[in-house]
UniProtKB/Swiss-Prot annotation:
<keyword id="KW-0687">Ribonucleoprotein</keyword>
<dbReference type="Pfam" id="PF00410">
    <property type="entry name" value="Ribosomal_S8"/>
</dbReference>
<protein>
    <recommendedName>
        <fullName>Small ribosomal subunit protein uS8</fullName>
    </recommendedName>
</protein>
<dbReference type="GO" id="GO:1990904">
    <property type="term" value="C:ribonucleoprotein complex"/>
</dbReference>
<comment type="similarity">
    <text>Belongs to the universal ribosomal protein uS8 family.</text>
</comment>
<dbReference type="GO" id="GO:0006412">
    <property type="term" value="P:translation"/>
</dbReference>
<dbReference type="GO" id="GO:0005840">
    <property type="term" value="C:ribosome"/>
</dbReference>
<dbReference type="GO" id="GO:0019843">
    <property type="term" value="F:rRNA binding"/>
</dbReference>
<dbReference type="InterPro" id="IPR000630">
    <property type="entry name" value="Ribosomal_uS8"/>
</dbReference>
<comment type="function">
    <text>One of the primary rRNA binding proteins, it binds directly to 16S rRNA central domain where it helps coordinate assembly of the platform of the 30S subunit.</text>
</comment>
<dbReference type="GO" id="GO:0003735">
    <property type="term" value="F:structural constituent of ribosome"/>
</dbReference>
<keyword id="KW-0699">rRNA-binding</keyword>
<comment type="subunit">
    <text>Part of the 30S ribosomal subunit. Contacts proteins S5 and S12.</text>
</comment>
<dbReference type="InterPro" id="IPR047863">
    <property type="entry name" value="Ribosomal_uS8_CS"/>
</dbReference>
<keyword id="KW-0694">RNA-binding</keyword>
<dbReference type="InterPro" id="IPR035987">
    <property type="entry name" value="Ribosomal_uS8_sf"/>
</dbReference>
<keyword id="KW-0689">Ribosomal protein</keyword>
Amino acid sequence: MVMTDPIADMLTRIRNANMVRHEKLEVPASKIKKEIADLLKREGFIRDVEYIGDNKQGILRIFLKYGANNERVITGLKRISKPGLRVYAKADEVPRVLNGLGIALVSTSKGVMTDKDARQLQTGGEVVAYVW
């Protein structure tokens, strides 16, 4: 079966694993998924990410992060730009998520970055998702 939106699938897997407080999850790998996972790790939303090569597509193993009393670090994930309706933002129109408490993942010509990085570099792009 062909997957029409692999990024939405990855975000949904993270959201579902987070809701039931799983320690880790696995998703089929791709370059953009790896960039998104690395960005989530850098911003402190996930604990770790590792790539497992299997002579085919590969697998990303994502380790979720929880607080001291097992509270969730990720409270929400939302896919914004979808295959049927792409959402783009100019450099001065890059959105803020919850007044800076969350991040917007923006796919630019310089790679996937947060909304803060995109504003600093004065570059726009496709608004992939919101994480808070």
